[in-house]
Amino acid sequence: MTPTLDTKYVFTITARIGDVVTAGETGIGVRRIIPIIGGEVTGAVTGKVLPFGADFQTIRPNELIDLEAKYAFETADGAIVYVENKGIRFGPVELLQELKRGEPVDPKLIYFRTVPRFETGHEKYRWLMEHIFVASAARHADRVVIDVHQVM
């Protein structure tokens, strides 16, 4: 028998976002680019989200949204951690349309899950590269809140 999969909450990334840029229909869906302009990291790791990077999204014809965010944060003790976070967001079409317009939607009604990967040269945070992480997220008008869990 293989090891049991358990997860443990480790930290939350709150990424503030800028205005959406749309590249239009690309043949596989509508391509959107959402700049990441700052934010914070709280929990077992603390720090600030650096004001660069973006979430590159493709909205499929069925409204399923493929997400691929690339950005970085700086820990409270000065380590730089690069983040690549891939995932999906899906839910009732009318609620997804409300989110696109920046209207509030109960996060429990939207399936928004990601698999973040981290890179850093700082020895103290090497463990971020030695484990698998999964996340549950919520989109708000001005930010995305990502609760990161370590797979044990």
Curated annotation (Swiss-Prot):
<comment type="similarity">
    <text>Belongs to the UPF0311 family.</text>
</comment>
<dbReference type="InterPro" id="IPR020915">
    <property type="entry name" value="UPF0311"/>
</dbReference>
<dbReference type="Pfam" id="PF11578">
    <property type="entry name" value="DUF3237"/>
</dbReference>
<protein>
    <recommendedName>
        <fullName>UPF0311 protein blr7842</fullName>
    </recommendedName>
</protein>
